[in-house]
């Protein structure tokens, strides 16, 4: 592990900082901890029938009241279970598909909690156009819990402000946090907008935290933000946040960016707890919420049920996840020993009933599987098929080479492939990605590799690794029926990042290492 990489490992692989030189790997271990009760609600929002048409403030409040009434019901249901905090989704109160003009009646005036100490429920007349904030504040008091919600807000600006829009106001996609006594304790204005013409991105990134008596410091960001350095990574790096409140309105995109998949990957990679509340509109591909710790997830994904869903879970105040370790067991797992040998350049040897066949890692014989290209996540991946019951595969693109060392208890008729992408993603956002992905293909043809599927039967014991140019690598792990699994081990070995798993309980849909090179966006 290079000195530069070691110097930054504290940021991403919590616990690896103890290893100044040499091996930095991570195994998943539990530790004793205190707990709190968290709740997230996946909300089927009542939407405006005509979001492009201008309505009155009163009409807007009447629509939002329908959603807020559901919120209050869920707060009280969570209170009966002893919840300390509840998180609601992005766009859950006002909906979406507005223009900049048509959303205006839905916006509350938003003072900064850094400048103003305010309890909207107890001081309802202090500011005009704050009816939604008042209602949320009163819910927090009634439920005796911290509450995080998302709403649209407005802020007047002067013509002397060079960034002031022509209509004389800023409009923000805003998360708010209230304490259990109704005080406004946090405001976050979404930085990385996702085709949201109704809203502005703030000139300066909000790095928002709020303190709680039950779990210390929480951070907030929204939806698309999870893929970018600001605010998500900087918030963890600079403020030592261990818990994230994450409202989102996420449209699932398989095989690499389903909602619960990226939520869990973020929690595992950074060793934090993520309270993720998604909107529930299955016809739009929008579902997938969860309470994710580095080791365990309580999630909900349902494309059939039209109604919302409340998740409540008991989670550690100090999440335990990636713990830096050298091998301390008397006997190393045989598959991991084989991985280390292959990584060091030793020949990979495959045993059958008649002989032992060895191929040097750098030399591929004439029977090696063919390389092909297929579109995955709108990107041109280079792939090789995964054939046989065991093997070692390699596939490269630009500076990234991905490897798979695998064994299969039984063959299935399904086609799997190992894919690599190292380049700038340019569809539905622009950002640089390095990805190694083991995926089930949609059919028997190579051209189906990368298609969106959610059911699988194939079982693997495997190591997946690559020579990533970034520290920020997210382990994506999705199994049949939109279920989540956790790696047995993650970490760096000889400047390669790896994921190890044995004993899958259901068929593998996706196992991937999703690297982000933030500086090359």
UniProtKB/Swiss-Prot annotation:
* Segment forming the signal sequence: 1-25
GO biological process per UniProt? biotin metabolic process
Question: Which CDD domains did the record assign?
Answer: biotinidase_like
Q: What class of enzyme is it?
A: hydrolase
Q: Which UniProt keywords apply?
A: Glycoprotein, Hydrolase, Secreted, Signal
Which molecular function GO terms apply here?
Answer: biotinidase activity
* Catalyzed reaction equations: biocytin + H2O = biotin + L-lysine; biotin amide + H2O = biotin + NH4(+)
Primary localization class, coarse: secreted
Residues with glycosylation annotation? 128, 181, 380
Documented EC number(s): 3.5.1.12
Per the record, what is one GO cellular component?
A: apical part of cell
Do the record's keywords include Nucleus?
no
Catalytic positions are 90 (proton acceptor), 190 (proton donor), 223 (nucleophile)
Q: Which residues form the CN hydrolase domain?
A: 50-329
Subcellular location(s) of the protein: Secreted, Extracellular space
Tell me the protein family, please.
Belongs to the carbon-nitrogen hydrolase superfamily. BTD/VNN family.
User: What's its job?
Assistant: Catalytic release of biotin from biocytin, the product of biotin-dependent carboxylases degradation.
Q: State the protein's name.
A: Biotinidase
Q: What is the lineage of its organism?
A: Eukaryota, Metazoa, Chordata, Craniata, Vertebrata
């Amino acid at each position: 592990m290079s000195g530069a990489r070691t110097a930054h490992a504290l940021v991403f692989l919590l616990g690896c900082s103890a290893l100044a030189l040499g091996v930095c790997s991570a195994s998943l271990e539990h530790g004793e901890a205190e707990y709190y009760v968290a709740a997230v609600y996946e909300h089927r929002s009542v939407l405006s029938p005509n979001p492009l048409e201008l309505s009155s403030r009163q009409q807007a409040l009447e629509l939002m009241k329908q959603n807020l009434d559901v919120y209050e019901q869920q707060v009280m249901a969570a209170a009966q279970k002893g919840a300390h905090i509840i998180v609601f989704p992005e766009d859950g109160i006002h909906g979406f598909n507005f223009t900049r003009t048509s959303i205006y009646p839905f916006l509350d005036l938003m003072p900064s909690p850094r400048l103003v100490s305010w309890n909207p429920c107890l001081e309802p007349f202090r500011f005009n156009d704050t009816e939604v904030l008042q209602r949320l504040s009163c819910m927090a008091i009634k439920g005796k819990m911290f509450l995080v919600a998302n709403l649209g807000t407005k802020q007047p600006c002067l013509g002397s402000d060079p960034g002031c829009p022509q209509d004389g106001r800023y409009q923000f996609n805003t998360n708010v946090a209230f304490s259990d006594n109704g005080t406004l304790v946090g405001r976050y204005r979404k930085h990385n907008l996702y085709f949201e013409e109704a809203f502005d991105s703030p000139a300066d990134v909000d790095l928002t935290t709020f303190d709680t008596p039950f779990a210390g410091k929480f951070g907030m960001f929204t939806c698309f933000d999870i893929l970018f350095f600001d605010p998500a990574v900087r918030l963890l790096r600079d403020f030592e946040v261990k818990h994230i409140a994450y409202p989102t309105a996420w449209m699932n995109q398989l095989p690499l960016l389903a909602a619960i998949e990226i939520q869990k990957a973020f929690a595992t990679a950074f060793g934090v707890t993520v309270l993720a509340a998604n909107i529930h509109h299955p016809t739009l591909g929008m579902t997938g919420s969860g309470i994710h710790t580095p080791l365990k997830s309580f999630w909900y994904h349902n494309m059939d049920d039209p109604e919302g869903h409340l998740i409540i879970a008991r989670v550690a105040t100090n999440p335990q996840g990636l713990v830096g370790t050298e091998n301390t067991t008397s006997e190393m797992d045989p598959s991991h020993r084989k991985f280390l040998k292959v990584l060091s350049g030793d020949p990979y040897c495959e045993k059958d009933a008649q002989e032992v066949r060895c191929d040097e890692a750098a030399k591929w014989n004439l029977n090696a599987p063919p390389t092909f290209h297929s579109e995955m996540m709108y990107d041109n991946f280079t792939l090789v098929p995964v054939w046989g019951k065991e093997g070692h595969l390699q596939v490269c693109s630009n500076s990234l080479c991905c490897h798979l060392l695998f064994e299969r208890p039984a063959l299935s008729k399904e086609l799997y492939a190992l894919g690599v992408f190292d380049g700038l993603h340019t569809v539905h956002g622009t950002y640089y990605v390095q990805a190694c992905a083991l995926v089930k293909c949609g059919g028997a043809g190579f051209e189906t590799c990368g298609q969106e599927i959610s059911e699988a039967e194939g079982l693997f014991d495997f190591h997946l690794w690559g020579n990533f140019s970034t520290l920020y690598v997210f382990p994506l792990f999705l199994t049949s029926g939109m279920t989540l699994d956790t790696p047995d081990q993650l970490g760096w070995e000889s400047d390669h990042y790896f994921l190890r798993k044995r004993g899958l309980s259901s068929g593998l849909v996706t196992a991937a290492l999703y690297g982000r090179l933030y500086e090359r966006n």
